A protein has these predicted regions:
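C-terminal amphipathic/interface module of NAD(P)-dependent oxidoreductases
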Residues: 250-285
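NAD(P)-dependent short-chain dehydrogenase/reductase
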Residues: 134-181, 187-188, 195
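Catalytic helix-loop patch of NAD(P)-dependent Rossmann-fold dehydrogenases
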Residues: 71, 75-80, 90, 103-146, ...
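NAD(P)H-binding glycine-rich loop region in Rossmannoid oxidoreductase-like domains
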Residues: 34-76
Length: 285
């Protein structure tokens, strides 16, 4: 359940209270079990928010496939989301729910449109995130559902950190080249989410960084190029790579044109995002 670590931790610094100058960064951190409806109701009602940004999720995709984990994954991604949506309805506040391209079947080459309803999740994670989406859209009118992909940021585990660590200890690495998408930098995403909740332009959106669609192989090559690594990157197919318990989408292309159409600023190029991110990692090390 790492969603709040990866994205939520970048939200507070991004938000300074546009309406009244009140800094969210001064608000206390409260640990909350979103699977407990009574606790969710009490904690959120005590705050009386104008908007709730729901980042918490079970994101361990392969572990979610374990028979003894499925109920827990569903309790978090679907049940917890329903609890939050119910409180938002009672309080008449906005809700923003972060979701994923995994709600689709991951096939083809055409970018997925935000308002596409051709849902065919490939795995338990995708199915439960879809159930979370439906909980929000069927409960509320004032909601944003924002799908993202290939997330990386300062906190939590992510692909960039993993490949940097692997590159330090291996002369060569094998990376899949037939899964296509675009990375999302949490620092950039947080600023977009703030803009969204200050608006009333509700609905479904896709939000990844700009710069076109790439493979994990392409991403790794750029990570090593910018980091100055000499590690050789070998492209392989998903079938050749193997190992994954949960099915992965080949097509994670998300169409983001609705953002601009509704007046939102697109996220910067992913290569620029990666450059800034690597710079921050060095500064913090």
């Amino acid at each position: 359940m790492r969603g709040h670590v990866g994205i939520g931790s970048d939200l507070a610094p991004a938000y300074s209270g546009m309406a009244d100058g009140t800094a969210v960064t001064t608000a206390p951190y409260v640990s909350l079990d979103i699977t407990d409806a009574d606790v969710v109701r009490r904690v959120i009602s005590d705050v009386q928010p104008d908007a709730v940004i729901h980042c918490a999720a079970w994101t361990a995709v392969d572990m979610a496939e374990d028979d003894d984990k499925v109920a827990q994954v569903r309790a978090v991604n679907a049940g917890g989301t329903q609890h939050i949506a119910d409180v938002c309805k009672k309080l008449d506040c906005k809700m923003l729910y972060l979701s994923t391209d995994y709600v689709f079947n991951g096939q083809g080459t055409e970018p997925w449109q935000p308002d596409c309803k051709d849902y065919q999740p490939l795995n338990v994670y995708g199915q439960t995130k879809l159930e979370g989406e439906l909980a929000v859209s069927q409960t509320l009118e004032k909601y944003f559902i924002v799908r993202i992909a290939w997330v990386f940021g300062q906190n939590g585990k992510n692909f960039v950190k993993t490949m940097l660590n692997v590159g330090k200890t291996h002369d060569t690495v094998r990376v899949v080249n037939d899964q296509i998408g675009t990375p999302t930098y949490t620092f950039d995403l947080a600023r977009l989410l703030v803009d969204m909740i200050e608006s009333d332009k509700y609905g479904y959106y896709h939000a990844t960084n700009e710069g076109g669609y790439i493979s994990w192989y392409d991403f790794t090559c750029e990570i090593y190029r910018q980091a100055g690594y000499t590690t050789k990157v070998i492209p392989v197919t998903t079938e050749e790579y193997g190992l994954s318990k949960a099915k992965r989408p080949f097509n994670s292309r998300l169409d983001k044109s609705k953002l601009v159409a509704n007046g939102f600023q697109p996220l910067p190029d992913w290569k620029d995002a990666l450059r800034r991110y690597l710079g921050n990692l060095v500064a913090r090390s």
